[in-house]
Swiss-Prot record:
Consequence the record notes for mutating K31A: Significant loss of bactericidal activity. No effect on catalytic activity
Positions annotated with a glycan in the UniProt record: N127
Classification via CDD domains: RNase_A_canonical
Organism, scientific name: Homo sapiens (Human)
Name of the protein described by the UniProt record: Ribonuclease 7
Pfam (any one): RnaseA
């Protein structure tokens, strides 16, 4: 009976570790970074770049291949200005989202294959409106804006 129990404990520990790792969201903000700084890294790209190279900068922080990501080809100041449009409901029900005035150039990157750090993406360039969640800037953020984007809620 003892040998069966000895084999059970490592399996249980492995299962618990797997469940714990599965709970870490891919979009979790890296330590030492504000939500707005992480938003800039994940979604701001004034000049379009190929997804395979652009996503390396995101994936190096998360240590995994992010499934889907959208880059807005706008200056940060333009996206921050979106935070001044009327509030609308976010997908999660919060009321701190704001819709862009019009369509902007963007690139959607979708994971096709690979394991970190060799993630491969398919890209799709589009012109669409977007919705961002905004919050007051934190101490480490630029205080230039009353509200700053912290989450890309959806593309319309």
């Amino acid at each position: 009976m003892a040998p069966a129990r000895a084999g059970f404990c490592p399996l249980l520990l492995l299962l618990l570790l797997g469940l714990w790792v599965a709970e870490i969201p891919v979009s979790a903000k890296p330590k030492g970074m504000t939500s707005s700084q992480w938003f800039k890294i994940q979604h701001m790209q004034p000049s379009p770049q190929a997804c395979n190279s652009a996503m390396k900068n995101i994936n190096k922080h998360t240590k995994r291949c992010k499934d889907l990501n959208t880059f807005l080809h706008e200056p940060f100041s333009s996206v921050a200005a979106t935070c001044q449009t009327p509030k609308i409901a976010c997908k999660n029900g919060d009321k701190n989202c704001h819709q862009s005035h019009g369509a902007v150039s963007l690139t959607m990157c979708k994971l096709t294959s690979g394991k970190h750090p060799n993630c491969r993406y398919k890209e799709k360039r589009q012109n669409k409106s977007y919705v961002v969640a905004c919050k007051p800037p934190q101490k480490k953020d630029s205080q230039q804006f009353h509200l700053v984007p912290v989450h890309l809620d959806r593309v319309l």
